[in-house]
Curated annotation (Swiss-Prot):
Family according to the record: Belongs to the HAK/KUP transporter (TC 2.A.72) family.
HAMAP family noted in UniProt: Kup
Keywords per UniProt: Cell membrane, Ion transport, Membrane, Potassium, Potassium transport, Symport, Transmembrane, Transmembrane helix, Transport
Function as written in the Swiss-Prot or TrEMBL entry: Transport of potassium into the cell. Likely operates as a K(+):H(+) symporter.
Pfam families given in the database record: K_trans, K_trans_C
Species this protein is from: Leuconostoc mesenteroides subsp. mesenteroides (strain ATCC 8293 / DSM 20343 / BCRC 11652 / CCM 1803 / JCM 6124 / NCDO 523 / NBRC 100496 / NCIMB 8023 / NCTC 12954 / NRRL B-1118 / 37Y)
Compartment(s): Cell membrane
Gene that this polypeptide is encoded by: kup
Listed GO CC annotations: plasma membrane
InterPro entries named in the record: K+_transporter, K_trans_C, K_trans_N, Kup
Transmembrane regions listed in the UniProt entry: 13-33, 54-74, 98-118, 137-157, 171-191, 217-237, 249-269, 296-316, 345-365, 374-394, 402-422, 429-449
Superkingdom to which the source organism belongs: Bacteria
Official protein name in the record: Probable potassium transport system protein Kup
Catalytic activity annotation: K(+)(in) + H(+)(in) = K(+)(out) + H(+)(out)
Amino acid sequence: MLKENQSKWSSAGALIAIGIVFGDIGTSPLYTMNSILNSAKSAHNLDTFVIGSVSLVFWTLMLITTIKYVIIALQADNHGEGGIFALYSRVKKPNKKWLLLPALIGGAALLADGTLTPAVTVTTAIEGLKGQGIGEFIFPNNQTIVLFVVTVILLIVFTFQKAGTKKIGKIFGPVMLTWFLFIGFFGLVNIFSDLSILKALSPTYAIAVLFSPENKTGIFILGSVFLATTGAEALYSDMGHVGKHNIYVSWIFVYTMLILNYMGQGAWIMSHANQENLLMQSSNPFFEILPSGWRIFGVVMAALAAIIASQALISGAYTLVSEAINLKVIPRLRTFYPSEARGQMYIGTVNWLLCIIGLIIVWAFQTSHNMEAAYGLSITITMLMTTLLLYQFIKQEMKNKILAFFFVVIFGMIETVFLIASLGKFLHGGYATLIIMVAILSVMMIWFYGNKRREAISQQNDYLSLKDYRKQLINLSKDNEEPIFASNLVYIVNIHQNYMLKRNIIYSILGSKPKRAETYWFVTIRSSNDPYEKSYSVDMLGTNNIVHVTLNIGFKVEPQVNMYMKQIANNLVKQNIIKPQFPKYTLNKRGTVGEFKYIMANQNYEDLLNLPDIHTWDRFIISGRLWLQSHTVKPSSFYGLEVSDVLEETVPLFIKDSNKSKIKLIQNEVKNVIKPE
């Protein structure tokens, strides 16, 4: 949905929100109650336990999802975008450098937990097929076959990502609407089997079950309850797709359907409390509440909902990584834009890492029961980090220190309790997502602080003023004794105040082989907080052939630098700001702009590692940063210059002073000299 239409809700927008935003939280009923049942001491006298457990789910969704995320967090958007990195971009200040740490930890944890979501949702859905018949065919009660089916589904989902979801995405809303109506209806039907489940609306039962003798895990039951709200962070992250007003309206419907289903599952469990196989892993209350004639339809709908939830998570991962690249905390990654649909992107590295890790998890954990035991630990960390950033938002943007204090205390305590409860998952597989989180966080820290240390060490003699070299560039441009290197010579640079730019750029132009051009272009690309911004400004530096262009590009916009430069050059020619160029050989006989040649002048930062006084920590982090750079996309590819005329250069980081090291002439004479006439 277009950003300009997000200021108000519409029925179409609400339908899109149901299809995109609520996939993760909407598939939680597949496994939440099943996981909670593992905390039951026995299959007898379950009423108090079940009512208390459903009450915990109800109030968890009310407090964390509804109040924290839907009511409060959705106010903290950054140009309409949500999520932990968008929130950080909104609140970051030069004097609040500590805010970066919770943003990095939260972002890494969110990406790590996302590796488990497709695996657990799709596996749970397909497990519902066990023993079910379609005509004369009976699906085998064989977990290995389930794993193969899950593998095929996940491979198909990840393989088709590069094609985009413009066409198929139109059915997400209707499918998820059908899903929520389906689970809500059968939940309501089962509530009538034991109306005492309605007691779950009282918070007293939620508190009581934590200390109930029927609860064999005590407070650690919250680790399973938390599964009901793991999609809340994804809900916030997907705000930019549909707008907060559509989320407000659609959440009322979604929340109602979810609670009806959880209560229906609870009522079914209580009405079957004396069945000895009730606590068996093969007995999932989500599927058990369905009449036998509806089971196959339920499995198909669950599989579709799981696929859509996975799709939403994958798209959210692309957005999250793009925001991280925009903040310069992750190396540049090759990004494709499968269609002209706004916000559609594809990052192959992210896609296949999610796929590979997800498949490893499927085959390592084998069953949805084992995956549930590991799921949710990392997301509690993300939620705690979001709470810290929201505290800063309320205090800084809403100017309400009292509300900020109560917010961070209340939700900090609630989420800390959930984190402690989820720590019980560590030995049951939670370590897997924590390892992934630490790996992602390490990449972020090395890249960000590697850049900081690299710049701090090298900047002492690393910058020159472009203004000081205007005359030389103008003279070089007019020097007919030098061959024309290019009509338009373009450098991607970062120009600071007073026209300061890196010395390697001037070295590249005026070095041993001067590069003569009709027009010199120095292009600074700014990453805009507005995800869809495409704008530019021009500074001619008092000349007609030295141009500083600043491109402001949002992180959801394809950086087609060559196309933008041709448009800008033609505009400047039309305005008579730069002289027209008439190429001798060209397809466009009316063209007034010649060819563009791009120079990527890369400094050899490995020179830093050879400095005798460099600190061991600096050496380590800069080495790590250089290693990451060597394994990621080149700037020319990132800026869409693959089919352009690009020259990659490497220039020395330090130019040695010839006066510091002198060589001595033997015998103080030169032999056999012929003096010039």
